Amino acid sequence: MDERDERNQLMPLGEAKALAATEFARQLLETAVEYKELRMMYACAIKEVQTKFEVLETEFKVRYQRNPISSIQTRLKSSSSIIEKMIRKGIPFSMENLEAQIHDLAGIRVICYYVDDIYALADALTSQDDITLVEKKDYIKHPKPNGYRSLHLIVSVPVFFSRQKRQIKVEVQIRTIAMDFWASLEHQMKYKREIPDQQHIVAQLKSCAEDIARVDMEMMNIRRRLEESVDEPTEDDILIARLKKLDTPIL
């Protein structure tokens, strides 16, 4: 063991992480051109997946007269978040490791109205010929200990550039409006430095998550009952409905 290794072992963990972060940042700057090109590729992969969801949204409007998507959010992981994650996971810094081991550099979040919309959209996306499902984590059927619910997918999508084609991974999160509301508030509270009676707050948040999950299921069941209880349409009703379908906004 050399003198530098001994110093690293003896220094406090926080200081060691700070030094590692500084070293990672320096290495990132040294590969700035390559790194910027990599971020560009991941940004383009986000566009590819976002377009797929927008196409599905348009199809559902026309085919089923109901839009399952409330909103679509996208994000490219910040450089500081990448450094923090690689240090936390003990991943040595390199462009190769960044591509191979950080699966959520590109992210897209789809907010739905109902729980069954989540699975319908996930199936529609992953059944497409050019989409490869890399990983699936169902936190709806198997919530996290804190109560978090969402469907997480890691997909690989081909992106065509002027001189090459690249397979790029994108993290897709699909959740209901209610799940997103809970996750947003929980995220804010998690980053508060001083939380009095923290254990009680954590228990309350989990209880709220369970209440929200029950409401989600009730709202979905109400919608299904309403769809099933529609009166048998007359010939005039059918004619009017067909005319309305012709006027459905495409874009």
Predicted segments with their positions:
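Active-site acidic/histidine clusters and adjacent loop/turn architecture
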Residues: 36-82, 87-97, 104
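Terminal, regulation- and interaction-focused segments at domain boundaries
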Residues: 105-111
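Gly/lys/ser-thr-rich phosphate-binding loops in alpha/beta enzymes
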Residues: 1-2, 160
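An acidic, glycine-/histidine-flanked metal-binding catalytic module
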Residues: 2-46, 53-59, 171-251
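Long beta-strand-rich cores associated with HINT superfamily self-processing modules
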Residues: 99, 112-221
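Short, charge-rich amphipathic segments
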Residues: 43-61, 139, 143-151, 157, ...
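Glycine-rich, low-complexity intrinsically disordered segments
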Residues: 15, 19, 69-72, 98-99, ...
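Short, charged low-complexity intrinsically disordered segments located at boundaries
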Residues: 75-86, 112-117, 151-158, 220, ...
